[in-house]
Amino acid sequence: MKRVTENQGKKTPGVDGEIWNTPHKKATAVHQLRQRGYQAQPLRRVYIRKSNGKQRPLGITTMKDRAMQALYLLALDPIAEVKADPNSYGFRKERATADAIEQCFTVLCRDYAAQWILEGDILSCFDRISHNWLLANVPMDKAILQKWLQAGFMEKSVLYPTAEGAPQGGICSPVLANLTLDGLETKLREKYPKATFALPKSQS
């Protein structure tokens, strides 16, 4: 409750137009979250401009869905940290881009350091994650996860289904993306055994 009512998005409603901005609304929401029969609602699709001039789609969840995701995130976060690649720095607690830069400095200042750096982006990473893979590998209530993944999104009063991807803007989406990418560093080390890695974050 505190996370979704005190962050920057607390005044941004989802498709239902609701925000929890009074003690009464918060108390009612707590009661509703304890009830059975939870159903995720579609996301409200908006677009934000990227630095390159292109627009990135962002999914705005309802306050109730945000609260449910925040609840499950309490359990998912520790698992994701245990499974995380050692040089993964994006979307992780107590880690930031500055840590990735420090890792780069550490390995490049050696006498035997590599003479080049390879930088790459995973195109549309969040949008292309397999729902089947998430349902098979993410350790949480599968029914709840499926409801989030298949909630769809509303754009100009039209409901669009979601067959793949983790919605950008969802509280759990960064952790789902990290769980999906775990093991990438190991695969790269196997293919390029002499390389040293620093993985800031995936790009959309």
Label each residue range with its predicted role.
Residues 15, 74, 120-122:
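Residues immediately flanking
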Residues 56-59, 115:
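N-terminal core-binding DNA-recognition domain of tyrosine site-specific recombinases/integrases
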Residues 32, 36, 86-87, 92, ...:
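Conserved polymerase palm-domain catalytic core
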Residues 68-76, 176-177:
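Active/ligand-binding-proximal structured segments within catalytic/core domains
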